[in-house]
Regions:
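A generic structural motif
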Residues: 28-32
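Short, flexible coil/linker segments at domain boundaries that flank nucleotide/cofactor-interacting
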Residues: 1-6, 75
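Output/docking surface of receiver
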Residues: 81-129
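Conserved phosphotransfer microenvironments
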Residues: 54-73
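Structural motif
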Residues: 11-15, 55-58, 83-85, 99
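Acidic, metal-coordinating helix/loop segments flanking the phosphotransfer/catalytic sites
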Residues: 34-52
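Conserved acidic segment of CheY-like receiver
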Residues: 5-15, 21-25, 53
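Conserved phosphotransfer cores of two-component systems
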Residues: 46-48, 71-78, 86
């Protein structure tokens, strides 16, 4: 089965980090909307639906805490990945990685998540039997 192409909202507090790391998600075949800061992330959530929201380590701790609530309020099926260990304690965070892990590790973590955007491919594969 081919890898699922996900629609990702990726937020960081630092524009340089955002641009550099978003390239890795795009190179893996995902469609990425990049946002810098909490307000931009909230606006994007109001305008579009996403399979996965990734909250980067350069967002403030307060933003990484507040945004998962906003994601689930916008769409309870959207998965949330926090690129910081403090995400493990949050009830609305589906997965987290340690700060500073390689992008390959982050991409591997995404592949192990049960993301709603991946499910239609699995269902379609099962229907063809």
């Amino acid at each position: 089965m081919a890898k699922a192409k996900l629609r990702i909202l990726y937020g960081e507090g630092d524009g340089d980090v955002l641009a550099k790391q978003a390239q890795a998600f795009e190179k893996a075949g995902h469609v990425v909307e990049k946002v810098e800061g909490r307000k931009a992330a909230e606006e994007a959530l109001k305008k579009s639906a996403f399979d996965l929201v990734i909250l980067g380590s350069t967002l403030s701790r307060n933003d990484r805490h507040h945004l998962p609530y906003m994601v689930k309020k916008a769409n309870s099926e959207t998965s949330v990945l926090v690129m910081h260990a403090d995400g493990s304690r949050h009830p609305y965070v589906d997965a987290c990685t340690d700060t500073g892990v390689s992008m390959e590790s982050v991409l591997n973590r995404i592949e192990t998540m049960k993301i709603a955007g991946m499910m239609p491919q699995v269902a379609a594969a099962g229907a063809g039997r």
